[in-house]
């Protein structure tokens, strides 16, 4: 548990009256708030950055950044880990060297095969990973009801339970038929996410402006299916955040 006593030690490290765990000198800081790049040092204590800029506090470990650029960790805002054909551990070896430190994962394939138990097992295993794993709770398990046999079913009750997890950040992508068709089960899943102050991911492939209006009215926050610039602009105009992916 994060306590006031722990916070006090971090403030002392920031002030310079407590020894840092690590200090990284001689870096070029890429400041995404001010859009500047400038020389700086970084002070780290208790696995937190507690000082940035001119940092001279003594540290247990001092690293020479050799003029390298320091940037915030990158976040992949939508990924299906299973389709990478890599385990989360192996995927970490690929993404960490390139600066990605957080994945927002819609593990719909795991859920279709192993249900809620599979998702909980993945979350438990993620504690050992070198990156942060956040969960977009799969909204379509099974994906095609009546046309497939799955190892698990995530109804409204199961989705609501999963949305209570600290690792859950959203309701995973909903395809247009579920929203435009006003299917009550999926509307209840959307409400379960909104009532927990979490967003709902979209999958608005091929939708024109009229249908996009309905989609936006259904509280779908984003879409990763824009192929042409005009599609991206249509989504922006309606407040739907376009996610740009290489596959599109």
Where on the chain are the PLM-derived regions?
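Hydrophobic faces of well-ordered beta-strands that scaffold small-molecule active sites
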Residues: 73-81, 103-105, 133-137, 169-173, ...
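Divalent metal-coordination and catalytic microenvironments
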Residues: 27, 47, 67, 78, ...
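Histidine-rich, glycine-flanked metal-binding segment
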Residues: 2-72
